[in-house]
């Protein structure tokens, strides 16, 4: 950014609670999910409540990511590398979309850019036998590993005031079907404040997909008040 060296800003901790459903209308599969991502202090590993912007010096409320509904239409054809023992499938998503916050003056210091441009790359790595073994159990999901790499714009809560630059995120993870195997911080959030996130959505909803920008718009007043994020998510009927 502005000729500066890359800066190590955060570590991350997260969970993606998801399920696939068959959609007869498109004759394909839809991935439905809820997602939590917590920002961690890279030195201590503690969940951040506030963050000091190293360029502006401002201390800001941290808006951890919580998306209660997302959906993704799984392509009919997916890039795959099939090997005798270990195989992988890859998904690459490149987007350039209008920024819904850009024209609102109250967000001018948070997200003034005209477009949101990002590149996301997912890779799932698994034993090749999972493609043909009909005796697999849910416990076998633990053998699936995930790699996720993203280049995208600053998060609105970082209040970068339109300065040039971007975030590079690099995640690794594993698949599990057991709630008890989640990180204690994630479990505590779900048990104490976000019971809606115990399960993935069961069907497609008639609503827009959550993003950092839509959430910032919806929760901006709470952000200014210094409320604790992610905000509570009680169980609710979804239509």
Region spans (language model):
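N-terminal segment immediately downstream of the Sec signal-peptide cleavage site
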Residues: 1-43, 173-177, 184, 188, ...
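Intrinsically disordered, low-complexity regulatory segments enriched
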Residues: 56, 60, 159-162, 218
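Long intrinsically disordered, low-complexity regulatory regions enriched in proline and serine/threonine
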Residues: 180, 191-199
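Extended soluble regions of mature proteins
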Residues: 116-174, 180-185
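Intrinsically disordered, low-complexity, compositionally biased regions/tails
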Residues: 49, 61, 166-169, 177, ...
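Predominantly extracellular/secreted and cell-surface proteins with exposed
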Residues: 3-141
